[in-house]
């Protein structure tokens, strides 16, 4: 990954780098790989995330359909 430093402005370049890393999901990946995760824990985490996504989608549908 490459960030250009313009006009010797390192702070702005660091902010751009952090934003890029955040968008790419590097921080999330680092957090997940910090410790070994058992396959059963991984399945449970992924299932919980799927349930959260489904609930969120259903809430959005209810809001959209209820507004009509």
Swiss-Prot record:
Domain of life: Bacteria
Molecular-function GO term, any one: structural constituent of ribosome
Biased composition (Basic and acidic residues): 37-49
Basic residues bias: start-end ranges: 50-59
Pfam family, one: Ribosomal_S21
Record keyword RNA-binding present: no
Keywords in alphabetical order: Ribonucleoprotein, Ribosomal protein
InterPro entries named in the record: Ribosomal_bS21, Ribosomal_bS21_CS, Ribosomal_bS21_sf
GO biological process: translation
Leader sequence residues: none
UniProt KW Ribonucleoprotein keyword: yes
Family affiliation: Belongs to the bacterial ribosomal protein bS21 family.
Stated name of the protein: Small ribosomal subunit protein bS21
């Amino acid at each position: 990954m490459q960030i250009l430093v313009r006009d010797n402005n390192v702070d702005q370049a660091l902010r751009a780098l952090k934003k890029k890393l955040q968008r790419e999901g590097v921080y999330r990946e680092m957090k997940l790989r910090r410790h070994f995760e058992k396959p059963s824990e991984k399945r449970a985490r992924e299932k919980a995330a799927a349930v959260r996504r489904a609930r969120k989608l259903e809430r959005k549908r209810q809001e959209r359909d209820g507004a009509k």
